[in-house]
Amino acid sequence: MHYGKNRVGKNAQIYDPVTLGFPSREYLGSKDFPGVIIGDDAVIRSGSIIYCEVIIGHRFQCGHNVLIREKTVIGNNTSVGTASVIEGYSSIGNNVRIQSMVFVPTNTQIADGVFIGPGVVLTNDRYPPTGKPELKGPVLEENSVIGAKAVILPGIILGKGAAVAAGSVVTRDVPAGKMAIGSPAKVRDMPKEKVRDTYDAPE
């Protein structure tokens, strides 16, 4: 089902039922409003809903039942796993891998090459419930990695190449090249075997 003025690039594979351009609150009841913009070679699997005013680059892929809210911008060669939720007003870079059942809240910034494991929860409200102007999602800098089922508190910055161990609860910034582990997480030096320096996206 399509709403709004959508623009989908060449060679897109869209497996119904998919909803493109669903109206945000300000456009409910309107028939004339912006849709989504999706680049070439996209694969969008059944059950997914992408709201209006979302911009997605080339070679995007998503699993089933993915929700992407309004005014989110996603770069090239990025994938989002099954049943993940990306709330509005967020930015996601190139070559990002978001695994299944991840929650990305409003006002989150995810840079190029980031990897987010399954079941990760990012948060944006330190003392809920807070009004929208106060919501501040995490900032995940280039090539940072988050292990499965970790929780990242509002406004936390993961530096370039930083890593978060599975199941950790991150309550303070993680410097570039460091690892956070535990609940609450403590910052340590990166193990010698380390994660990768960059993510090599498939052609």
Task: Describe each model-derived feature in a short phrase.
Residues 1-14, 18-181, 186-187:
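Structural signal for interior beta-strand "rungs" in well-ordered beta-sheet cores
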Residues 191-202:
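A glycine/serine/threonine-rich, flexible loop-to-helix segment
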